[in-house]
Amino acid sequence: MKKVFMIIAAMCMTSIMASAQKTIRVSTDKTDLVMQVSPKGRLYQVYLGDKLKNPSDYNQLKWDVYAASDGSVCQRGHEVYATSGAEDFFEPAVAVTHADGNMTTYLYYQSSEEKAISGGVETIITLKDKVYPLTVKLHYAAYPKENVIKAWSEISHKEKAPVTLWRYSSTMLYFKANKYFVTNYHSDWAKEGQPETCQLTAGKKIVDTKLGTRAAMQEEPFFELGFDEPAKENEGKVMLGTIGWPGNFRFTFEVDNVGALRVIPAINPYASNYKLKAGETFTTPEFIFAMSDNGIGEASRNLHNWARQYQVNMGMEDRLTLLNNWENTGFDFNQQSLAELMKDAKDLGVDMFLLDDGWFANKYPRKDDHAGLGDWEATKSKLPDGIPGLVRDAKKAGVKFGIWIEPEMVNPKSELFEKHPDWVIMQPKRDTYYYRNQLVLDISNPKVQDYVFGIVDRIMTENPDVAYFKWDCNSVITNIYSPYHKENQGNFYIDHVRGIYKVLTRIHNKYPKLPMMLCSGGGGRMDYEMLKYFTEFWCSDDTDPYERLYIQWSLSKFFPAKTMGSHVTNWNKNTSVKFRTDVCSSCKLGFDIDLKSLSGDEYKFVQNAVKNYDSMKPMILDGDQYRLVSPYEGNHCAINYVSKDRQRAVLFAYDLHPRYKEPVMNVKMQGLDADKVYTVKETNLMPGKESDLECNGKQYSGDYLMKVGLNVFSQTDGTSHVLVLE
């Protein structure tokens, strides 16, 4: 028996040595992802890390990194897209029940190709099963300059009947280090972006959501990985990862029997055994990741640059400052009061007036959140001249006009629900559970897609000067049943999201220059697929400036300031309007406040702050962000932005709740030109107040500012300073 075992082992090794091994490389300027085809035709990841300088070094990489632990004599590796029922015993990337009931799949390399895309190169690898006519195409889009890679997969087949997919990952990545640490972000309403770090040990950690819509309300679709130590801001090997999917998602982190970490980003398979017909293609969400040897800061700046250039709708264009009426009026307004607010917006100096919830429905007028959703015509008793009258009043005031919609939702007390109850996600045989007094429309249904598109299209067709939409989504999916899918409920969750994409694609194709804010009861939706259609998202309904510093700090690791809406409100009136405005000015600035409640000096301050923001916007929205002092690590917070040419910078410094007589350290800036001499000037000062900073008006070299820094913190709660350097 031993002799037979040795003969088989020798045959395996001979086969390995005799076969030429094809190597496929996905590269940025700083990162290499290298794959290799084994002699038997299977595809394995052989390297993911710092870019290798010498091409000859790729020949030294081996696919067979370890032997199986079950007595198998042939060596094994890390399969790029591991299947279910084969020789891998861990979480698969793809799992299929074939038309005949067989649950095994073996994928073999067929071909690979490269094609140029805007800003990079896309590699497409085709894998096929030899027994069943099943094909998987792996896509990798590499952006060399930004050091970002985007990965997704396509699954198709030509079997005689539908197959069932029960795993369908975007990609599968392997890492090797002594220790692994993951930071994921959990949340709730008004409590977004809460980081939690843990060490990954043998076994599996899963981060997922099952909310359907508003899917990021409890878990955010992004994470940090730290190798050998928890991820740090300015040092150490890290990876930032995020999935572009506003529905149920799942991150699987699994440390295997040889200590390798497998990272599997995917649509959550919860209640989603997907029936795929022959000839159809199942396309997974995009997984975007950036690696760095210099900590989170470098990786996030790369993500920001990539997002603005290649992913976010109108990512290289300006953003509008605005005044929103919601916290001022709630549902209680009319055409005359809105016209006055438009004049206030003009006097404030912002670009636009945004009308929020409460403007629609007639049979069941939108007086509160119990009625009206679905009936998208202006309430005649409130707005006798309708949207055309509002657009006219805004134009007369000298500002643009934007409007709020929640087109994916319906109130049972609405004409839409009375006419089309079959358009609603609702159990036919059980009591109905309402979330915020509303239900979700079944957008997997093409008729509902037409209806939702028609809401925006009708408003824009009748009112082409409408300049902006705030698209809200305040409910998760409850009463899970799709009248459209009937007996095929396993496809519903996924097709619902795809239905939303179809609607948004139609809107974007017809109105490509229409800015839209993505909102979901706060930050319940924030992902890079939706940002292909939206210019920005609402970070949180929590606008308390203290809490906003924590939220904005977390989200800025993954999203540029240009995409993060932040409004000055009356939340936490114990803080000054200056502190609230300075917090919001570090993102995409807006106001949602009763301006008449401000004192004369406060009003002059916000007017000047808008002018100052307009001057600083190129740095904040399009420059490089450096997070300097974390609110999570003490009682202060500081960030700075630097223009791309490094000629200008802005520093935001905030005192949260300093301890009595605590030591106050200088803030060392980052990203400056070490050889340039900068003049420091404090801005956003209250009328009649002079700066109390010793550095104000002085000149310093960039080298000094980065090595010695400036004394800009105080020991007073709710104090803030904004310094412009040029």
Model-derived regions, located:
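Polysaccharide-binding surfaces and accessory modules of carbohydrate-active proteins
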Residues: 22-35, 42-254, 270, 677-694
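Carbohydrate-binding surface patches
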Residues: 30, 223-225, 233, 630-673
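Active-site neighborhood of glycoside hydrolase catalytic domains
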Residues: 384-386, 418-420, 424-578, 588-593, ...
